[in-house]
C-alpha cells in the first residue's frame, strides 16, 4: 500500500506541474510578488497642531483588539524624545496628549479557489479517494499532502489593523469638546455637542489610522513589528 501512496504523490506532482503550465505566467508572477511582506499605513485625516515652545507630551496607548500588539507606546516615546519632546506620566502637566487605541485586528484570506490549478488538484484528490484498495488512513495522508500544496500557493493572507487616534493640545481659549457619531449604515459622520462634555482649555483632534499587511501564508507575528513601526511613525510625524 505504501507503494500506491508514493505513486499517487508522484502523479499529483506531475498534475501540479501540468496545471501550472496551463495557467501561464500571471499566477506565477502573482505568487512571486506576494512572497515578501508588504505593509502599508495611512491616516484618514491630517492633524495640524499649533506650534508651541512647550514640548511636554503625555502618551496613552490601549489595545481593545483580540491580538497582542504592545510596542507602540515605547516606539512613539523614543521618536518624540529624539525630536526634543519631554515625555511625562502626568497628563495635567502635558501640553500634548496622545491617546491611541488599537481598535481592531482582522485577518482576511484571499484564496484563489476558482482558478485552474486549484481545480486540477481537487479533481485529482477526488480520483484518489475512489481508487480501489486504499484505506481511510491513506486517504488522510493524501488529503494532508494536497492541503499543504494548496495552502502554500493559494492563501494570500491580509491583516488589517484599525487604530483610533486622539491628540489634544492645551490652549488659552475656552472650548467645547465635540464627539463623533455614526448616523447610518453608510457611516456618515457628523460632529455634535455631547451635553455631558465639559468645557476646557484643550483642542481635540480625532482621526483613524489603517494598516494593511500582505504576504502569502502570512502569520500575524511576522507583520507585527513592521505594523508597530509604521503606526508609531504615523503618530509621531504629527509633531
Swiss-Prot record:
Belongs to the TraT lipoprotein family. Coiled coil: none annotated. Keywords: Cell membrane, Conjugation, Lipoprotein, Membrane, Palmitate, Plasmid, Signal. InterPro entries: TraT_complement-R. Its main location: membrane. Transmembrane segments: none annotated. Responsible for preventing unproductive conjugation between bacteria carrying like plasmids. Residues 1-24 form the signal peptide. GO terms for cellular component: outer membrane; plasma membrane. A lipid is attached at residue 25 (N-palmitoyl cysteine). A lipid is attached at residue 25 (S-diacylglycerol cysteine). It is found in: Cell membrane. This is TraT complement resistance protein. It comes from the Bacteria. It is a lipid-anchor. The gene is traT.
